[in-house]
């Protein structure tokens, strides 16, 4: 039964956004209270769906008055528990989920400036379609493009397959609009390419995971649309062979768009899931490397030249045909889907780590990760972004995920790497932040957060332990 204060809170929220957009029934809230992995979940009093930056500000001010926490959420495709409420515990404040899925306005593409303004609920696919309609393209892409949104991609500083060429989401944000914990609207959507007037809101909020302000819109950079593409799937004898291939590609292929890595376990899993045999295969395969090139003319000649001279290749397939390329890319894009299906079969949510190390340490990382998985008795399925030394380590049927994390993340830190390359910290990796950040660094980050949100209202427990 709701208290009088809770009833009043719901009434005020309903006045702010409309009663139809304040979801209080258990069955309506359920999908917003659990994340995509199924591993992280927590209860909320209500899900509130504002339709404008003014409504976002009003909701935040109401939450402040009633001393409830607020969890910003859009596509809810996060993998580290940062987009859902924290588990219920004695004495904890109640939570409101703010769903930004109604903020879907997309401005006219400015083809001269190569920019567009998008609200936080616009999906990456919609962003890309808008750019394509104007003869341009988007610089960030990843498999969850149909549901992942602009707001979430900025909040986590998302990466994806095109980081090699264009950088992470932070580099694409040339203007931002957000609402602070005081309900104040800050930032600018002007998109000036040169501006040095004080602190840069886009840089501050990218990667802040909803802890400093709620992102409501952004002015985004666009890039040329290279309509001639070539994709190669290459089987190599060793991780060292893959790294040498990467170096050769970087030196010689000016159209290089992405260089991905797929472990044989991941290739077998996705192959079984989609019902297609791998396009390349050999008993000698230690690793698969997927290469994407894109240009204004056929980029395959440079790519073929490098592949013909590279050592350690045991098999390869290359295509410029759109249908065949889509088939090749499916072996990368549907890995996460295949992992989720396999985890459903064993009845245990996938335990995921997203790490990066210097390229010369990748071999050591893979050995440590496999050893930790073997000790646990679970199935390790690695894939990722070779150019950035970024591996997604997926554990199917893990019995003791914390032990795996301790082993792997400690090794990552000792190898000079990071415990989060693109998925963010969320709540999942907070206990290991001290591996890569010294106390002064953590104190400074906490001070920034306290200055903007002294009541710890916005996404408490994310990036820092709750209450710090």
Predicted regions and their residues:
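N-terminal flexible segment immediately upstream of the FAD-binding catalytic core
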Residues: 1-61, 78-114, 143, 266-277, ...
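N-terminal accessory segments
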Residues: 1-36, 66-68, 310-327, 414-419, ...
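Residue-level signal for inorganic ion chemistry
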Residues: 13, 63, 121, 183, ...
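C-terminal substrate-recognition/cap domain of FAD-linked oxidoreductases
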Residues: 24-32, 224, 230-235, 241-403, ...
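Conserved, mostly hydrophobic/aromatic
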Residues: 63, 210, 453
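FAD-binding subdomain of flavoenzyme oxidoreductases
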Residues: 105-260, 457-458
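Activity-critical C-terminal alpha-helical subdomain
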Residues: 184, 430-468
């Amino acid at each position: 039964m709701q208290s009088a204060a809770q009833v009043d809170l719901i009434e005020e929220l309903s006045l702010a956004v409309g009663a139809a957009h304040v979801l209080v029934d258990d069955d309506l809230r359920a999908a917003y209270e659990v994340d995509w992995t199924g591993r992280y979940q927590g209860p909320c009093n209500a899900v509130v769906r504002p339709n404008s930056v003014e409504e976002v500000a009003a909701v935040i001010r109401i939450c402040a008055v009633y001393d409830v926490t607020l969890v910003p959420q859009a596509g809810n495709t996060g993998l580290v528990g940062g987009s859902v409420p924290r588990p219920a515990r004695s004495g904890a404040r109640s939570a409101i989920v703010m769903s930004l899925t109604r903020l879907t306005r997309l401005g006219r593409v400015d083809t001269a400036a190569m920019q567009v303004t998008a609200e936080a609920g616009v999906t990456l696919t919609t962003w890309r379609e808008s750019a394509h309609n104007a003869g341009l393209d988007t610089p960030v892409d990843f498999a969850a493009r149909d549901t992942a949104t602009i707001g979430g991609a900025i909040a986590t500083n998302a990466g994806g397959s095109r980081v090699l060429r264009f950088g992470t989401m932070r580099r694409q944000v040339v203007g931002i609009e957000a609402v602070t914990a005081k309900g104040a609207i800050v930032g600018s959507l002007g998109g000036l390419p040169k501006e040095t007037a004080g602190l840069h809101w886009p840089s501050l909020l990218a990667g802040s995971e909803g802890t400093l302000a709620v992102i409501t819109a952004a002015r985004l950079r666009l890039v040329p649309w290279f309509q001639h593409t070539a994709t190669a799937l290459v089987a190599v004898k060793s991780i060292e062979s893959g790294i040498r291939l990467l170096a050769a590609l970087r030196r010689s292929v000016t159209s290089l768009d992405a260089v991905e890595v797929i472990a044989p376990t991941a290739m077998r899993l996705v192959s079984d899931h989609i019902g297609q045999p791998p396009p390349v295969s050999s008993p000698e395969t230690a690793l698969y490397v997927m290469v994407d090139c894109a240009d204004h003319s056929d980029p395959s000649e440079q790519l073929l030249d490098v592949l013909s001279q590279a050592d350690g290749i045991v098999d390869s397939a290359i295509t410029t045909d759109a249908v065949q390329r889509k088939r090749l890319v499916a072996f990368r894009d549907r890995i996460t889907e295949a992992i989720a299906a396999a985890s459903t079969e064993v009845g245990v949510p996938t335990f995921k780590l997203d790490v990066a190390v210097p390229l010369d340490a990748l071999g050591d990382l893979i050995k440590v990760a496999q050893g930790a998985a073997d000790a646990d008795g679970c199935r390790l399925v690695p894939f990722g972004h070779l150019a950035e030394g970024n591996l997604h380590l997926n554990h199917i049927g893990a019995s003791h995920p914390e032990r795996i994390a301790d082993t792997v993340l400690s090794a990552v830190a000792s190898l000079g790497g990071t415990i989060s390359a693109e998925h963010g910290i969320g709540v999942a990796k907070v206990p290991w932040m001290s591996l890569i950040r010294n106390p002064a660094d953590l104190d400074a980050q906490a001070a920034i957060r306290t200055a903007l949100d002294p009541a710890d209202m916005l996404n408490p427990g994310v990036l820092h332990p709750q209450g710090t």
